[in-house]
Amino acid sequence: MINRIAYAASTPLALLTLCLLGSGAARADSADSVPPNTVRLGLYDIFYHVHAQDLSGPYVPPGVGIDVQNVQTLYVAYVREFFSHLDLELAIGWPPLTKTEGRGPARLGSVPYNGQVISTARWFGPSLVANYVFLSPEHALRPYIGVGINYTSFYDRNNTAAGNAASGGPTRLSLSPSVGPVGTVGLTYRLDRRWSFYASYSFSEVQTNLTADTAGVIRTTHVSFAPGALIVSAGFSF
């Protein structure tokens, strides 16, 4: 009967990305400074904090809700340093298969519901984040904070057999895309001019309107995912 989340690039993000890639921003660094471009590769460990309104529509008893299982996926990012304390990060996670569980009554009639995986979906959620990096570049270990914007869209939305049974038949799902803020805190450790390691925690706001269509019978709910993501990665600068 549903599914989702989340992480950054709608039309304004695309424009910002073009500016990022094409900018020749001056850098007040010495000739042997770290190169301005970095590619990061690592792991997203995503934790959902789901708040969903009870499902509404025909033949829906009170207290019928959902939850989302946590996931892990690949983290890829391009980072452009503009100044020694400021960079812009475009982060993209490999779209993971995310599972939605029923929450509420143990059964809907004779059909098991609570704890059953009722739907699956994949999401694509890039984020564009401006990071402020503390301390001078001479320090190997530097903390940073960042704020930005996230865009999340959903696809490959499918009800499971358990979801179709709970819905009363084959059900089509739709979830609206989401645009919301994202914040991050992290640490970077530089090994040399080229190689570095990163650890961070990001928090974003992802919301969607879910519609489930069972042979013309429409049920809806509004879902707020407040996904947190623990990220560890390695970076190569060029």
Tell where the protein language model's regions lie, with residue ranges.
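Predominantly the C-terminal beta-signal and adjacent terminal strand-loop region
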Residues: L97-K99, G183, L191-F238
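Hydrophobic, lipid-facing positions within transmembrane beta-strands of outer-membrane proteins
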Residues: N37-V39, Q72-V76, F124-L128, V179-V185, ...
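Extracellular loop and loop/strand-boundary signature of outer-membrane beta-barrel proteins
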Residues: Y59-V64, V111-S119, A166-L173, A215-H222
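Short sequence motifs at beta-strands and strand-loop junctions characteristic
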Residues: I66-Q72, I118-G125, L173-G180, H222-A226
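Cleavable N-terminal export/targeting peptides
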Residues: M1-P35
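Gram-negative (and chloroplast) outer-membrane scaffold detector with strong preference
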Residues: D29-S30, D45-F47, A77-A161, F225-F238
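Short glycine/proline- and aromatic-enriched beta-strand/turn motifs that initiate or cap beta-hairpins
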Residues: G24-V79, G235-S237
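Outer-membrane beta-barrel translocator domains and adjoining extracellular loop/strand segments
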Residues: H51-P58, T100-R107, Y155-A166, L210-V217
